[in-house]
From Swiss-Prot:
Disruption phenotype: Normal sensitivity to DNA damaging agents. Mild UV sensitivity in the gen1 send1 double mutant. It is an enzyme of class 3 (hydrolase). This is Flap endonuclease GEN-like 1. Residues 1-96 are annotated as: N-domain. It comes from Arabidopsis thaliana (Mouse-ear cress). The gene is GEN1. Its main location: nucleus. Changing residue 75 to A: Impaired nuclease activity.
Length: 599
């Protein structure tokens, strides 16, 4: 998908590794089709409707854990140009001879798979109930994602299609992994421009040469490396026009490259003017001359010095000789490349260029995007009907998203306190939790006995200590959520959720300051106690396991004492016995000793 020829490998050195907080408070455009297709093969048959489950969990993770404002984009009617490329790709992957490819009529688009379209419709229904904006593109979803990014409606795009850069994207994220400590790759167009010296039209030119979603073949015999060398010779304003000239059979004048006519005669005439060089040292002059009189370049009193491995003469002729050879090599390379491009039919395809440079990919104004509140009742009905989930499970899984909305509203205008079904209110900060290398507050949400008014307590629970919870990375292909914990304390019901530290601090600054102050006091007290224990170590401590010899008499000690007393006598007797045995054995014949030894 996207530009062919391992195009991502060309861009990977300029990727930035970003963590959880990079997307916080940022608007991101998501290619919904990518999420649906990504894990369909891996989990197909193991869970019911994996596309709905994945979209549900990933959206909540993106909204609550990453703190982003997602905008989902779905594909519209595909371009007729892509229909032929899709059929060709299917034939090659299936091992079918491409000579039997059906011909698509001009201007006719092949409709997408009906089952896949049904999956998209179900996911759109789910997202709308979650209050997430969904946009439909006039063509490709990655094209609309790129347009939203280039026009400033979103801050980044989440799509694996590398042709998002060709459509004008400024920041592209290939994929996110909520349940992993590994950072995700983020590509900025500004870094690509400074690193490779390529701009948007340069990338379009590379895609025309190596292949793309609309022309999977490209130019035969040209890969990413050759395409990069070609487009670097032209400016952004000229590169597409120069490719048009080459496709028409014209060979443009490239600096340091092609010259008109054949320069072979000039090169051979230069070779005839070659001055003699010593075969021993490589400098000007013959070997015989250097033996008669020393070489002035070697600096010897007599003769010359044998040239080292890889020696290069720097005289004017040799330098010019190397330049001419390099010029000839470059000329030959450019002639071959231009011939390959000229043989490609209808190169470059102007319709593909216009498609990449088009901005009319969206119906309406992107500024009308808005994020609403989830319709809990309808969501419960949908998930119970589609996935056969328990209603209480659906509400629990929605809690991280609802709590994030609550904290954002609280931080924005300091009003409103109902969290979920007007039942839970902010109670306290339990602890700091570290998971996958990311710190968050564990918040206790209380369901009061009376909901007539809002109140919160500064009192810290007994478990209000800093907890560092390092868990193994999840292998769940559907990026499932952790089910919120439920606690009962003195008749009150508490729900525990993980929340962003900065968001909680903005919503409840006093409670956060109180918690951090108490945490600091506990740490200083713990440090003082440890310093006192280090300064005055005790013989026995409650935290040190005692040896079993402190409770029972050791037989080894008594045996060791006896061995010290009898050590000398036993050694002497053993020595006498050994000498007697050796003496008696020496008097026996060899055959007798063998029978005694082996029986």
């Amino acid at each position: 998908m996207g530009v062919g020829g391992n195009f991502w490998d060309l861009l990977r050195p300029y990727a930035q590794q970003q963590g959880f907080d990079f997307l916080r408070n940022k608007r991101v455009a998501v290619d919904l089709s990518f999420w649906i297709v990504q894990h369909e093969t891996a989990v197909k048959g193991f869970v019911l409707k994996p596309h709905l489950r994945l979209t549900f969990f990933r959206t909540i993770n993106l909204f609550s854990k990453f703190g982003a404002y997602p905008v989902f984009v779905v594909d519209g009617t595909p371009s007729p140009l892509k229909s032929q490329a899709r059929i060709s790709r299917f034939f090659r992957s299936s091992g079918i001879d491409t000579c039997n490819l059906p011909v698509i009529k001009d201007g006719v688009s092949v409709e997408r798979n009906k089952l896949f379209s049904e999956w998209v419709r179900e996911c759109v229904e789910l997202l709308e109930l979650l209050g997430i904006p969904v946009l439909k593109a006039n063509g490709e979803a990655e094209a609309l994602c790129a347009q939203l990014n280039s026009q400033g409606f979103v801050d980044a795009c989440i799509t694996p299609d590398s042709d998002a850069f060709l459509f004008g994207a400024m920041c592209v994220i290939k994929d996110i992994k909520p349940n992993s400590r590994e950072p995700f790759e983020c590509y900025h167009m500004s870094h690509i421009e400074s690193g490779l010296g390529l701009k948007r039209k340069h990338l379009i030119a590379i895609s025309l040469l190596v292949g793309n979603d609309y022309d999977s073949g490209g130019v035969l015999g040209i890969g990413v490396d050759k395409a990069l060398r070609i487009v670097r010779e032209f400016s952004e304003d000229q590169v597409l026009e120069r490719l048009q000239d080459i496709g028409n059979g014209l060979q443009p004048a490239v600096p340091g490259g092609i010259k008109s006519g054949d320069d072979g005669e000039e090169f051979r005439s230069e070779m005839k003017k070659r001055s003699p060089h010593c075969s021993r040292c490589g400098h000007l002059g013959s070997k015989r001359t250097h033996f008669k009189s020393s070489c002035e370049h070697c600096g010897c009193d007599s003769g010359c010095i044998k040239k080292p491995l890889g020696f290069r003469c720097e005289c004017s002729f040799c330098s010019k000789d190397r330049d001419l050879r390099e010029q000839k090599k470059t000329n030959d390379w450019w002639i071959k490349v231009c011939d390959k491009i000229a043989l490609a039919p209808e190169f470059p395809n102007r319709k593909i260029i216009e498609l990449y440079l088009s901005d009319g990919l969206m119906t309406g104004d992107g500024s009308s995007m808005s994020w609403g509140t989830p319709d809990t009742g309808m969501l419960v009905d949908l998930m119970v009907f589609k996935l056969h989930w328990d209603p209480s499970y659906v509400r629990k899984m929605l809690l991280p998203m609802l709590s994030t909305i609550y904290l954002r509203e609280k931080a924005r205008n300091n009003t409103g306190y109902a969290l979920l079904c007007d039942q839970y209110e902010f109670h306290s900060i339990k602890c700091i939790k570290t998971r996958y290398g990311h710190q968050s507050f564990v918040i206790r949400w209380r369901k009061p006995k009376s909901t007539s008014g809002y109140s919160h307590s500064h009192s810290e629970p007994e478990e209000s200590i800093v907890v560092l919870e390092e868990e193994e990375e999840s292998v769940d292909p559907l990026d499932g959520l952790n089910e919120p914990q439920v606690q009962n304390d003195n008749g009150d019901c508490f729900l525990l959720t993980d929340e962003c530290i900065g968001l909680v601090q903005s919503a409840f600054p006093d409670e956060t300051e109180h918690f951090l102050h108490e945490k600091k006091l506990r740490e200083s007290k713990k440090k003082n106690v440890s310093e006192e224990e280090t300064a005055t170590p005790r013989a026995t401590t409650m935290g040190v396991q005692r040896s079993i010899t402190d409770f029972y008499r050791s037989a080894k000690k008594a045996a060791a004492g006896q061995s010290i007393e009898t050590g000398g006598s036993s050694k002497a007797s053993a020595e006498k016995k050994r000498q007697a045995t050796s003496t008696s054995s020496s008097n026996l014949t060899k055959s007798v000793r063998r029978r005694l030894l082996f029986g």
